A protein has these predicted regions:
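N-terminal chloroplast transit peptides
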Residues: 1-66
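Hydrophobic transmembrane alpha-helices
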Residues: 5-14, 50-53, 93, 99-107, ...
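Cytosolic, membrane-interface loops and tails of multi-pass inner-membrane proteins
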Residues: 52-54, 58-74, 152-160, 229-237, ...
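Membrane-interface helix-loop junction between the first two transmembrane segments
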Residues: 72-75, 107-121, 147-164
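N-terminal membrane topogenic signal
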Residues: 80-96, 126-134, 331-335
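Alpha-helical transmembrane segments of multi-pass membrane proteins
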Residues: 98-114, 141-150, 178-185, 347-354
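Membrane-interface helix termini and inter-helical loops of multi-pass transporters
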Residues: 113-125, 153-156, 187-200, 229-233, ...
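Portal/gating segments that form or line small-molecule/metal binding sites
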Residues: 177-242
Length: 362
């Protein structure tokens, strides 16, 4: 959900670290020749290896195996954007596709005089007078279609092709997402007020920063915009670098941060209902995503899973994920800069977003 705290305010190349190379001399003592006289034949020291030496060898072997596993990527390097491989024609096509999609979305769904969304929201609202219940129903409908179609992706792509399936997926998911976002914007202050913390000094700045950070987790799909728009053939990716080193499910983490920030700021029952719906959907999405990746990538996914975590930084802290020295470079890439620009742009565009939502009267 792309709204932020400012809704309520007045101002609104794959990295392969070199493998650890063990020393050529193993920690065993060389056999020593005992002193002897001409009358005594030489004899070798047959003292057994000490437990200390054996332990060192075992530790060395385990360390080597762990280092090799952590330094050999089986997934893809995320957020790579090579200008030399970009085609101007592809981005012109992307712009044209985006324009057509937005036009059709407006005429067929959003516009109250021609679209279907108003009738859809009215039908859902007729089920309950509670904005919280309507909010949860809208989330449930979106989640069923979005996650359901994601689960059917492999079969659907085999049946009609990757691009055609992406068009159908987006054609259903996008209108439902827009409807849910607009309903939240229009009714976010219609619930029962549970707490009021907006007057606490510094809380707005803290929550705004939290919301800003959440977008770096929320939108990893910006790494492949041409695939999102089906300009390039859509693929299932097994990412392993960048934000994935911190958490295997960045969208879940970003959504939790976003929900907590907005719920703390708004402080009412509608915000709580929206957060319950969003977080529940993303928890299921994390489980379902792991299941689908395990089916598609098999052992490669299991390797990535072993050295990543869902909880941010957990795999790093317990040593399963070893960050390369230049880890920060995985974030100094165009897609992350694009996320920064779009997030700031959305912040300053909030008055326009609110006005557009209010005019729909959903």
């Amino acid at each position: 959900m792309a709204t932020s705290i400012m809704l309520s305010t007045s101002f609104s190349s794959t990295h392969h670290p070199s493998l650890f190379r063990p020393s050529s001399s193993l920690p065993f003592s060389k056999p020593k020749l005992l002193s002897h006289s001409s009358s005594n034949p030489p004899c070798w020291n047959t003292k057994p290896l000490s437990l200390h030496h054996t332990f060192n060898f075992t530790s060395l072997a385990r360390s080597l195996t762990k280092d090799q596993e952590n330094s050999t990527l089986v997934g893809e390097d995320s957020a790579v954007f090579d200008l030399t491989k970009q085609k101007i024609s592809s981005w012109i096509y992307f712009t044209a596709v985006l324009g057509v999609v937005l036009f059709v979305l407006n005429v067929a769904w959003i516009d109250n005089s021609t679209g279907l969304s108003k009738a859809f929201v009215d039908a859902v609202s007729s089920l309950s007078d509670s904005h919280e219940v309507v909010m949860l129903i809208l989330f449930l409908i979106f989640a069923v279609f979005h996650s359901g179609m994601a689960s059917l992706r492999d079969a659907g792509e085999k049946l009609i092709g990757e691009r055609a399936f992406r068009v159908i997926f987006a054609g259903i998911s996008l209108p439902l997402a827009v409807t849910t976002v607009v309903y939240f914007i229009n009714h976010r202050y219609d619930g029962v007020q549970l707490w009021q913390l907006q007057s606490i000094p510094g809380i707005h700045s803290f929550l705004w920063l939290s919301n800003f950070i959440s977008f770096f987790f929320l939108y990893p799909s910006t790494f492949n915009l041409l695939e999102v728009a089906a300009v390039d053939k859509p693929k299932v990716h097994l990412w392993e670098t960048g934000i994935i080193r911190i958490t295997r499910h960045p969208q879940l983490v970003g959504q939790v941060i976003w929900c907590l920030a907005h719920t703390v700021w708004i402080g009412n029952s509608v915000a709580v209902a929206a957060s319950i719906g969003l977080i529940s959907h993303h928890l299921f999405g994390a489980w379902n995503g792991d299941r689908r990746l395990a089916i598609r990538f098999g052992e490669d996914f299991e390797k990535v899973k072993r050295r990543t975590s869902i909880v941010p930084f957990a795999a790093i802290l317990d040593g399963r994920q070893r960050l390369p020295k230049d880890f920060y470079k995985e974030f100094i890439r165009l897609p992350y800069l694009a996320i920064t620009a779009v997030t700031l742009g959305a912040y300053f565009a909030h008055p326009l977003m609110q006005t557009a939502s209010y005019n729909l009267h959903w």
